[in-house]
Amino acid sequence: IRDCLLSRGLGDVYKRQVGDRYVYFSLPAWKGAGVAVPVFSLRSEKSFGVGDFGDLKRMIDWAVSTKQKAVQILPINDTTMTHTWTDSYPYNSISIYAFHPMYTDLKQLGTLKDKKAMADFNKRQKELNALPAVDYEAVNKTKWEYFHLIFKQEGEKVLSSAAFHDFFESNKEWLQPYAVFSYLRDVYKTPNFREWPKYSSYDAAEIEKLCQPESADYPHIAIYFYIQFNLHLQLLAATEHARANGVVLKGDIPIGISRNSVEAWTEPHYFNLNGQAGAPPDDFSVNGQNWGLPTYNWDVMEKDGYAWWMKRFRKMAEYFDAYRIDHILGFFRIWEIPMHAVHGLLGQFVPALPMTREEIELSLIHI
């Protein structure tokens, strides 16, 4: 515990005791080596041009064989906004819950009964796997072609299963808005929901209607239910495989959300959408950094006991025994930049105790 002198303004100084005694807790001794790797880099002969959750399970086998104890991955949430390579940045997701469809192991979805179509996909798989790097657009385009065909073939059976029913009931709070958002994004050709001619303001009752089986839009929405259910099963299988073999699977939680995301659409009150987060200038970035992400409205979040974060952490804990928060310092203060700014130069830390002009001049720092 130490005494700190703080200032509210010129000549107004008060003392506060600051300590960190309550942030420590005992942990069992643990020592081990591990590897950090993006899932998209885990390409194998069984992949479809990009690493997937099936490859993640095989990565755990490799960790076991090399006596490693941890596998850490980058964010795996859906980042689809334009269906172009600009969506490939893993830290700008459209949902904090939904996984990126490209991480689906297509083999686990089943084989197409159309033998000619299946042969064509097998040929394209070899072509994509032979590339020196991931062709993001080609991979996602091809996988979505497969999704539509396999959903038409197997979707009704899967969506009527007890396992899907349990998944849906446990996840519908985020799953329905995500599925509708993704559908409307493609219908209106933009992820910026503010520009949508209809549903630009989130209405839970209207979204619920769209998700009903009798809705004309249902088939286009239900395919997202199907994909997310399979992603859940595949990642959970990798998780259980890791736990059974004594390997810690570690996830990644980006602190920010996209301005054009499901959360910004459904829960705008939790965010300061009139500012953007970034980083101040330093030796690595002389103009600072502008991430373009809204900051959090912590005062609003505090009122419900940070329920938004609690739900997010609980969901992550289903799949990961540890996760990185990038970056934890942002929970305490963040570099906030005006909306008109391009670089990070004009930002300021929030919250902060700023110095007045008079205080700066009294400190012999002249401006």
Identify the residue ranges that each predicted region occupies.
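Active-site capping/gating regions of soluble enzymes
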Residues: 289-364
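Flexible glycine/acidic-rich beta-alpha junction loops that bind and position SAM and/or redox cofactors
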Residues: 77-84, 258-261, 281-291, 329-340
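Single conserved hydrophobic/aromatic residue that forms the stacking wall/gate
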Residues: 1-14, 365-366
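Short beta-strand elements
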Residues: 12-23
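Acidic, His- and aromatic-enriched active-site or binding-groove loops in soluble protein domains
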Residues: 88-113, 263-286, 343-363
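Generic detector of well-ordered alpha-helical packing
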Residues: 4, 253, 327-328
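Acidic/aromatic-lined carbohydrate-recognition and catalytic surfaces
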Residues: 27-268, 301-307, 311-315, 334
